[in-house]
């Protein structure tokens, strides 16, 4: 109970107490057990309740992390070497940091104190802290961090995708699939004469280069003899789809419902309801969607709740499609032409106090019907749910276009507004523009700022 196993024998836990103050209630006292690999998370994190202790090991707590110095250095950097010096001060988190200057230099560099594990170790799973192998780390010099400086292809980008190997080694990480990266490359490669208006359009691009391929994989599994009229019409819509997720598109409504049903019918029987919902909230599920549709030999296709029967890929995808169309008919009606994306994909900026019904109209901003989707450049993302409604739970915290040859006419937009005061006119004055993919001119000229500013005076109470 008070000891844990290590490669050199058993050691005592270091035990500390943490006190959480709760307003208008008793303090919550937590007893935390510390090991060589970090704190034991059993009982603290959902899904970790077994007898074997599971600890959390994080570079952030193990290395010198000069975050404030890094921010200061980056803010005051004069050139590329200054920039890279600032990035090198960040031990964690791992970030893709972009650079550009008025002299035409461009670069990107990952931050973080990166390391290599033994070749036999799979970091996608919980590691064994007792064998002396899984926890061996070779910390790497900053020069080994993935980066590109003035690359021959003349641009840099990041979409949280897997970077190329360094010295033959692919750094493991919690990456997103290649969807956005593929679309960005597809837009950048053919064109050299970019304007800030072109870049603004690209930032709001709603098209997936991958989704039509996935849709084709799904369609290939269908038994065409068993389709209703609505199902046949739905298939034709998906066959003609270019991957766009605009307000009046019908295909994304059908596609996402089918995707959700296929994931549910594939994984929920093995994982159970709680773990399946947890999986839906991770990056892992986004990595799974495309390759699983092609993997006919996957053991996941079998529904373990059915006895004396082994389901196949085709059976699960057919079942998922029929269910998707039936559910959409119930949710949106029998007219497929009315199944437009704006009816199910919405954005509402929710305030903690907005959960109170009487205060919702004061503090919450929206909802708005919005274009975009998961894993498109206009990444207004959502989690799948039985409801068939795709409520945005994340997206760009800001959109900016800065032309170094015309700084004073740069463009930006915020999701809601500049003020956090719900009674300010600037609390939500950008929200509709943001939802519509529009921009506002940034004020970077001192004279213009002074000319259009207002004065706020704070007077002490007497």
Model-derived features with residue positions:
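C-terminal/peripheral segments of proteins
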Residues: 1-220, 224-227, 240-462
């Amino acid at each position: 109970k008070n000891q844990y196993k290590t490669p050199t024998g058993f050691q005592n836990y270091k035990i500390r107490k943490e006190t959480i103050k709760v307003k208008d209630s008793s303090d919550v006292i937590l007893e935390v057990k510390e090991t060589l690999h970090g704190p034991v998370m059993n009982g603290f994190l959902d899904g970790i309740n077994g007898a074997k202790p599971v600890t959390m090991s994080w570079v952030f707590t193990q290395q010198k992390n000069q975050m404030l110095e890094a921010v200061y250095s980056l803010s005051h950097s004069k050139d590329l070497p200054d920039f890279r010096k600032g990035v090198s001060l960040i031990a964690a988190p791992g970030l893709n940091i972009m650079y550009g200057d008025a002299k035409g230099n461009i670069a990107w560099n990952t931050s973080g104190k990166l390391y290599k594990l033994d070749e036999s170790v799979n970091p996608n799973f919980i590691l064994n802290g007792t064998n002396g192998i899984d926890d061996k780390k070779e910390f790497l010099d900053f020069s080994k961090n993935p980066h590109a400086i003035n690359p021959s292809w003349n641009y840099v980008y990041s979409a949280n995708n897997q970077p190329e190997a360094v010295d033959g080694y692919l750094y493991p990480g919690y990456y997103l699939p290649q969807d956005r990266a593929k679309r960005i490359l597809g837009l950048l490669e053919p064109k050299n004469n970019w304007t800030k208006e072109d870049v603004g359009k690209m930032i709001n691009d709603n098209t997936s280069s991958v989704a039509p391929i996935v849709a084709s994989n799904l369609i290939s599994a269908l038994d065409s003899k068993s389709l209703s009229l609505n199902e046949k019409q739905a298939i034709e819509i998906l066959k003609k789809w270019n991957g766009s997720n605009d307000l009046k598109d019908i295909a994304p409504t059908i596609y996402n419902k089918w995707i959700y049903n296929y994931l549910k019918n594939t994984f929920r029987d093995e994982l159970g309801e709680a773990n399946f919902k947890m999986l839906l909230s991770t990056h892992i599920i986004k990595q799974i969607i495309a390759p699983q549709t092609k993997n006919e030999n996957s053991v996941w296709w079998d529904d373990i709740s059915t006895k004396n029967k082994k389901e196949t890929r085709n059976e699960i995808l057919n079942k998922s499609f029929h269910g998707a169309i039936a559910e959409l008919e119930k949710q949106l009606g029998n007219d497929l032409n009315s199944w437009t994306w704006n009816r199910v994909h919405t954005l509402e900026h929710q305030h903690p106090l907005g959960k109170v019904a009487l205060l919702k109209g004061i503090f919450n901003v929206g909802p708005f019907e919005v274009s975009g989707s998961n894993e498109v450049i206009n990444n207004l993302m959502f989690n799948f749910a039985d409801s068939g409604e795709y409520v945005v739970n994340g997206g760009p915290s800001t959109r900016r276009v800065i032309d170094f040859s015309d700084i004073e006419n740069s463009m930006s937009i915020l999701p809601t507004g500049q003020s956090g005061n719900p009674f300010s006119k600037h609390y939500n004055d950008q929200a509709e523009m943001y939802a519509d993919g529009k921009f506002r001119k940034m004020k970077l000229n001192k004279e213009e700022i002074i000319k259009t500013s207002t004065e706020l005076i704070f007077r002490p109470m007497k």
